[in-house]
Amino acid sequence: MPGPRPRKGPKTSGQGAETAKQLGLFVEFNPEDMLLGMDETEDDGDLEAELLALTGETGSTSRKPAPKGRAPLPMAHIEKLAADCMRDVEEEGEEEEGLEDDADLLTELQEVLGVDEETGLVDDSEETSPDLSEEKTRDNTEQPVAPAAFQQALPAAVAQAGGPRGLQALLEERIQNYREAAASAKEAGEAAKARRCERGLKTLESQLATVRKGGKICEDEIPPPVALGKRPPAHQERPSKDSEIDSAGSCAMDPGDLSQPESSLPAVAALPDSDPDPQALLLARQREYKAAALSAKRAGDLDRARELMRIGKRFGTVLEALEKGQPVDLSGMPPAPEDLKALPQASEASAATQVLSPAVEQMQPVMSSDLPATPAAPAEPKTVLDALQQRLNRYREAGIQARASGDERKARMHDRIAKQYQDAIRAHQAGRKVDFAELPVPPGFPPIPGLEPRKDTEEDSVTATLAAAQKLASEDTALVDEDEERDTPAQAPLAKKPAQPLVPSSHLLNEPKASSSKESLSPSVREQVTLLEARKLQYQRAALQAKRRQDLEQAKSHLRVAKSLEAQIIQARAGQPIDLSKVPSPLTDEEGDFILIHHEDLRLSQKAEEVYAQLQKILLEQHEKCLLFSKQFMHQGNVAETTRFEKLAEDRKKQLEILQLAQAQGLDPPSHHFELKTLQTVRIFSELNSTEMHLIIVRGMNLPAPPGVTPDDLDAFVRFEFHYPNSDQAQKSKTAVVKNTNSPEFEQVFKLNINRNHRGFRRVIQSKGIKFEIFHKGSFFRSDKLVGTAHLKLERLEKECEIREIMEVLDGRKPTGGKLEVKVRLREPLSSQDVQMVTENWLVLEPRGL
């Protein structure tokens, strides 16, 4: 059996604290112990002796012996640690030892500090020249001085530039520097340096945009210039350029001119590289040429004026390139116009054309690919994908150029167009249909293969339309143009000349294509094209007449219609189907088209005036009928009948003009007769949609009155019900109440929704029809009373587009004697065309009666 538990002895004091320390509890952390790795420093004898010496007390002889602890680190060990720490810095300095021999960094430092590459001399204005000479002899440990020099040189350069304008010039120069550095790095295959230059270029472009908008930037954040490497000095290229200009001038001179040194052209002055503002020089030279052209015109020398003005206009192209930030070589700029006065008048035009034209062309070598009017157009694409890719690349380049010049709005516009081309390329590659007509076309680009070339801009087309309309006029417009030139300043007509030759040139280029394509068209398509061209000509004539009446709004409206007809003509010639229902209707006569001259001494008899009025009324009615029939056939797509009725309408119009002219001159009414003419027409209600049917409740006749109500007190209204799409969702409505009559006139139109191809609609048409109920409106305490019912059958809508029916009003099955007239209209019959033969008494005026 277990024995009794042994009794525990009493615990000694302090044993619990030792246990807690062993468990990690209540441990006193000493920062010096943690730093020096010492367990106890309280019982250090040296420290206690020093403390007693400071306090002036005598040491206690009865203190405990110091426990043996860890001694502090020796100084040799500490020095070794310090040497190890310093060793990294020295090794890093040794790694940077080769930076002094880096040619790119040295060139970059020399450019910032203004040091010449070959001589090593510094500009007088720089204060860092002694530092540079000392830096070349210093040790490798002094190498980090270079970044400080960069930071000091940058504000100095900005301060010398002078304000925001100088800051903008500095940024533009720095952008050009980074572009050249990126290009040279790409050519050398240094991808890292190229990416670094591109990042700096983006920063500079954003800073330039901020400065142009009037914002402020931190000058310390401007990236420093980068080294471009060794390039051939500029003074070596100068003699070659001068020799080329001299050789060009010597080649352009004729041998016959050697005997006449006073008539030779002066040498073309090259613009020095240090010219501060080339734009001001170009503007001044352009103004000189314009002033010289104006003075030559006033002096009567028109040939010289034209030549000077032609040269002056070429400066505009160079100025546009300069504004876009493109590099322009001004070494071939034409001389001042005063230097050309020595030329004889006979040989001035030819000599100026031979010498000055190449000189002006030398100023714009960079712009040959950017201008829309230049002959250097993109290569002709072989496939649709090539054409789309060419245009995508062009708009991307335009967006980059706009963003570089700070025009963010234009850059975003080009990016959106580029996105459209990207979507079009993806859709074309996926085999989906792409509407290429909606894609913008860059100027000067060839058309997409397989498509018709696009026309000019809207302004050019309006100008072309006006020019074509003025050709139709019988007046001589040349004299009017000469008078306008005399009244207006001399510069105004000269500025408009470039737009005028573009119109006939485009037409001359398109005429052979149009004629050849027209010959290959089918007869039906040829009829459509003839109709559209005649309609376009009619609107152009109307626009010209409106312009003569000073009605510019009407003229613009007619020109827009003529422009829309141009697009339809192009589609018809390309073989695409044309919806003739969307072709604008022929113009109708207006009262202001005719001027009636009343003579006081010429009086017509009352009978003659009545005859004239009757004849004019008949002609107007026949003219309107012809236009109506023409419109109906146009909606059917029958071009032949449309043209026929338009010619009849034109004949009625001419007869009406003859009649009004005879009445204005006071003549007797012309001899006339009537002929029976049978016209085959197709009935159609073009104002209706194919998804709607109109129900017209016209009138009630002799409706019965309910018991207790007299016929004169009948307040009638009609309620109808059309069971489509089904009986539960039948279309219902009612007319307004017509009071106190048994023959009410309703004349109300109700629009019913239908689906012509739906089987249920055909079933309702053939079997059910429309049910009508006639009610008498009750008073305040009385309900409505049923008068009678009627039913309309709709089978005739299969072959007719309108049903007009006078139905018997029934009381149950018993007739009441009342009638109800209704009409039902569709756009066109359900199964076939509604062909009608119309016989008209056709009025014919005899010419001998005039």
Curated annotation (Swiss-Prot):
> Where on the chain is Phosphoserine found, per UniProt?
585
Q: Read off the SUPFAM superfamilies from this record.
A: C2 domain (Calcium/lipid-binding domain, CaLB)
* Organism this protein belongs to: Rattus norvegicus
For bias type Low complexity, the affected ranges are: 489-502, 511-524
Q: Where is the composition biased (Pro residues)?
A: 440-450
Q: Where is the composition biased (Basic residues)?
A: 1-10
Q: Which family does it belong to?
A: Belongs to the CC2D1 family.
Can you say where in the cell this protein is located?
A: Nucleus
Q: What is its main location?
A: nucleus
Quaternary organization = Interacts with CHMP4B.
List, alphabetically, the SMART domains matched: C2, DM14
Report the superkingdom from the record: Eukaryota
What keywords would UniProt list here?
Coiled coil, Nucleus, Phosphoprotein, Transcription, Transcription regulation
Renumbered to this chain, the Acidic residues biased-composition regions fall at: 114-129
Q: State the name under which the record lists this protein.
A: Coiled-coil and C2 domain-containing protein 1B
Domain (C2): give its ranges. 668-807
Query: Mind giving the lineage of the organism this protein is from?
Result: Eukaryota, Metazoa, Chordata, Craniata, Vertebrata
Gene name of the record? Cc2d1b
- Phosphothreonine modification sites are 588
Q: Name one GO biological process term.
A: negative regulation of transcription by RNA polymerase II
Q: Where do the record's region annotations for Disordered lie?
A: 1-21, 54-73, 114-145, 215-277, 436-525
Q: Where is the composition biased (Basic and acidic residues)?
A: 234-244
| GO cellular component, as recorded | cytosol; endosome membrane; nucleoplasm; nucleus
Q: What does the UniProt function comment say about this protein? A: Transcription factor that binds specifically to the DRE (dual repressor element) and represses HTR1A gene transcription in neuronal cells.
Checking InterPro entries in the record gives: C2_dom (IPR000008), C2_domain_sf (IPR035892), C2_Freud (IPR037772), CC2D1A/B (IPR039725), CC2D1A/B_DM14 (IPR006608)
